[in-house]
Amino acid sequence: MTLRLQPVQVATGSDEDGMLIFDGHRLVAVLVRLSGVHEDLGVAGQWFLETGYGPLDVRDNPTFADLVAAEAWVKQRLAERA
């Protein structure tokens, strides 16, 4: 499995820094970096799964401390469904 991350701008309003995650040539997830608006929740600067596809399409979208944690979760989910 080869994951590729590509930075993008996402039109969500407050959280614009995004990351597309590809498994090979297939888009499997869109992450957004949570802005300071989320400071009161203690998650500002963390990465949120805006949407996932296939095995990453989950009911409760997770938040990750950093991209390393997000990549590890993506790899685990994809491996479970392989």
Language model regions located:
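Negatively charged, low-complexity tracts enriched in Asp/Glu with abundant Ser/Thr
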Residues: 1-27
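Intrinsic-disorder/low-complexity peptide segments enriched for small residues
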Residues: 1-3, 29-32, 65, 76
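Short aromatic-glycine-(Arg/Gly/Cys) micro-motifs in beta-strand/loop hairpins
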Residues: 32-60, 77
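A short, charged, amphipathic alpha-helix used as a generic interaction element across diverse proteins
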Residues: 54, 62-82
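A generic structural signal for ordered secondary structure
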Residues: 27, 60-62
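Acidic interaction surfaces
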Residues: 11-15, 34-36, 62
